[in-house]
From Swiss-Prot:
Binds 1 zinc ion per subunit. Belongs to the AspA/AstE family. Succinylglutamate desuccinylase subfamily. Gene3D superfamilies: Zn peptidases. The lineage of its organism: Bacteria, Pseudomonadati, Pseudomonadota, Gammaproteobacteria, Alteromonadales. InterPro entries: AspA/AstE_fam (IPR050178), AstE_AspA_cat (IPR055438), Aste_AspA_hybrid_dom (IPR007036), SuccinylGlu_desuccinylase (IPR016681). Transforms N(2)-succinylglutamate into succinate and glutamate. This is Succinylglutamate desuccinylase. Its EC number is 3.5.1.96. It catalyses: N-succinyl-L-glutamate + H2O = L-glutamate + succinate. GO terms for molecular function: hydrolase activity, acting on ester bonds; succinylglutamate desuccinylase activity; zinc ion binding. Keywords: Arginine metabolism, Hydrolase, Metal-binding, Zinc. Pathway: Amino-acid degradation; L-arginine degradation via AST pathway; L-glutamate and succinate from L-arginine: step 5/5.
């Protein structure tokens, strides 16, 4: 496998050739400058040997296997590093979240992987399916990556996705709930420079991958939506040039040249509530082609279930991630209201 990767420099191909696991981990050096470790299928770590690094960066993709643009983006960056076109100045771990689902061409195999972090994988039925086992392993890899360095360091985790539904804001990011910690203006402007100018501030703990890293390691973590789902090879990668350029600057230690914080360049939303499904007959009162961030007025009947109406409570609320087909007990939609910059640092 070592020789296969050294020759092809295609980490995605190696991962998809071994979607369940690698028979052994391996490591090697790139010249005199970078140490490379492959811990498992879809798990590769790059550590600068010479540079005095101060950041530990996790870039994850394919937590949902059919969200292909982030997979192609991450694999392109990995190939550039393995080809020594990029010399890193910071530690970086790339995670290809659900190789079996990529191989299958589906969002997941048995269960939504991004509902299984922060220990959720071991609740109820326990480690009973591929996603639960993978979530447990991914948590261990993140812990190992962050815990191996001591002292004052910045921990970053960008979990990259694409959305099933069209959106009034093509690219947006979810900033996990972080009680007692203000949100970072610098991180928000980094995302704005990546072409992600819409930020959702979450209102409660969740079981997402980004929340896991934020809560347990105080990482600057985000779930980042980069547009709409397309089949592998059919993504217009020119739409991700800014993201790739900024990630390259971050990893190689170059000056990010971030603009001053400017509210006029941003769309800020506060998640005001989650609407969970309580009955099998849950249905939305809008068509399937309604876009993310569509706003509805107070009193509008958003959905119906169990003979009762779910109504809009604030003057206006916007929707994101509506999905009536989730199992009973899970979230069907996040409701948003506009936010200001009062909770930013």
């Amino acid at each position: 496998m070592f020789h296969e990767l050294k020759q092809s420099k295609d980490f995605l191909a190696l991962t998809l050739a071994h979607p369940q696991y690698l028979s052994e981990s391996f490591e090697f050096d790139l010249g005199e400058h970078t140490h490379v470790e492959v811990w498992d299928t879809g798990v590769i770590v790059f550590s600068p040997k010479q540079a005095k690094h101060s950041k530990d960066i996790v870039l994850s993709c394919a937590v949902h296997g059919n969200e292909t643009a982030p997979i192609e983006l991450c694999n392109a960056l990995i190939t550039q590093i393995l080809s020594e076109e990029l010399t890193l100045a910071q530690r970086v771990m790339f995670l290809i979240g659900n190789p079996a689902a990529i191989h299958n061409g589906t969002r997941f195999i048995d269960e939504n992987l991004n509902r299984l972090f922060n220990g959720a994988h071991s609740r109820d039925e326990g480690l009973c399916n591929p996603e639960r086992i993978r979530a447990h392993k991914l948590e261990q890899y993140v812990d190992r990556f962050y815990a191996s360095q001591s002292g004052e360091r910045q921990r970053i985790h960008y979990d990259l996705h694409t959305a099933i539904r069209g959106s009034k804001h093509e690219k947006f990011a979810i900033y996990p709930y972080r009680p007692g910690r203000k949100y970072s203006r610098e991180q928000i402007m980094f995302l704005e420079s990546c072409g992600v100018n819409t930020i959702l501030f979450h209102h409660e703990p969740t079981t997402t991958f980004s929340y896991f890293s934020s809560e347990n390691y105080r990482a600057d973590a985000f779930t980042i939506e980069l547009g709409k789902v397309f089949p592998m090879g059919q993504n217009d990668m020119t739409r991700f040039i800014a993201m790739k350029e900024m990630l390259t600057l971050l990893m190689t230690g170059k000056d990010l040249q971030l603009p001053e914080f400017d509210l006029k360049r941003l769309n800020l939303y506060q998640v005001c509530r989650s609407v969970n499904k309580h009955f099998d007959d849950f249905e939305f009162n809008f068509t399937n082609d309604v876009e993310n961030f569509t706003a509805f007025p107070k009193g509008y009947t958003l959905a119906k279930e169990g003979g009762k109406a779910v109504k809009i409570e604030h003057e206006f609320e916007s929707i994101v991630f509506p999905n009536a087909k989730v199992p009973v007990g899970q979230r069907t939609v996040l409701m948003l209201k506009t936010a200001d910059d009062s909770n930013l640092d």
